[in-house]
């Protein structure tokens, strides 16, 4: 399975692509960032992020997308920009019918390092170890995006299978009720 991870941001939107499956070795395919200029108008920045994400989706053809869930920060302007970039990422994936999984920063940190309180350096170090790399992907936003993809492969795909099984079960029950007039 190929997963594209996205660490949303207005100035730097980290992106990483990882191939793998639960119980199998993981391989980093690519890592980088979509960048916009801080002095550009917001609509132009959002369009730039969309074009960049679409290009990554075209180039790497992922099976799923993992996006960092926006959490409340003290700086409202920062969280708004991050939320807008996150929405662009989700829309790009949804437009293609790709499964999207949102992961909190602490969930990703816990999956990668074993601690939800790990710092960026610890996450980067563990990403490099997990993927057998000489050094963490750069910039740090790309390493975070790769960590998101790993988190999806280790956790998100299982959660998705459970959700699909629940939906299938609910449909089966509904069909049985209809057949028996309940």
Curated annotation (Swiss-Prot):
Catalysis performed (reactions): Endonucleolytic cleavage at a junction such as a reciprocal single-stranded crossover between two homologous DNA duplexes (Holliday junction)
Residues that, per the record, bind Mg(2+) 1: 7, 141
Active site feature: 7, 68, 141
Sequence positions that bind Mg(2+) 2: 68
Annotated Pfam families: RuvC (PF02075)
GO cellular component terms given for this protein: cytoplasm; Holliday junction resolvase complex
A Gene Ontology BP annotation from the UniProt entry: DNA recombination
GO molecular function, one term: crossover junction DNA endonuclease activity
Cofactor note: Binds 2 Mg(2+) ion per subunit.
UniProt-listed InterPro entries: RNaseH-like_sf, RNaseH_sf, X-over_junc_endoDNase_Mg_BS, X-over_junc_endoDNase_RuvC
Claim: Nuclease is one of the keywords in the record: yes
UniProt keyword list: Cytoplasm, DNA damage, DNA recombination, DNA repair, DNA-binding, Endonuclease, Hydrolase, Magnesium, Metal-binding, Nuclease
Principal cellular location given in the protein's record: cytoplasm
Protein family per UniProt: Belongs to the RuvC family.
Subunit architecture: Homodimer which binds Holliday junction (HJ) DNA. The HJ becomes 2-fold symmetrical on binding to RuvC with unstacked arms; it has a different conformation from HJ DNA in complex with RuvA. In the full resolvosome a probable DNA-RuvA(4)-RuvB(12)-RuvC(2) complex forms which resolves the HJ.
Name the UniProt record assigns to this protein: Crossover junction endodeoxyribonuclease RuvC
Organism listed in the record: Thermobifida fusca (strain YX)
């Amino acid at each position: 399975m190929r997963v594209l991870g996205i660490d949303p941001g207005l100035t730097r939107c980290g992106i990483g692509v990882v191939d793998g499956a639960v119980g199998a070795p993981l391989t980093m395919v690519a890592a980088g960032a979509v960048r916009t200029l801080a002095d550009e108008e917001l609509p132009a920045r959002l369009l730039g992020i969309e074009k960049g994400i679409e290009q990554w989706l075209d180039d790497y053809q992922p099976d799923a997308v993992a996006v960092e869930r926006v959490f409340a920060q003290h700086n409202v302007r920062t969280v708004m920009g991050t939320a807008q970039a996150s929405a662009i990422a989700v829309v790009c994936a949804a437009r293609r019918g790709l499964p999207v999984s949102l992961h909190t920063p602490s969930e990703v940190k816990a999956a990668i390092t074993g601690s939800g309180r790990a710092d960026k350096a610890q996450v980067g170090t563990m990403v490099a170890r997990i993927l057998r790399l000489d050094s963490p992907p750069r910039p740090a936003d790309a390493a975070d995006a790769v960590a998101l993809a790993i988190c999806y492969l280790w956790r998100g795909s299982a959660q998705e299978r459970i959700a699909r099984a629940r939906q299938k079960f609910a449909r089966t029950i509904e069909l049985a009720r209809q057949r028996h007039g309940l």
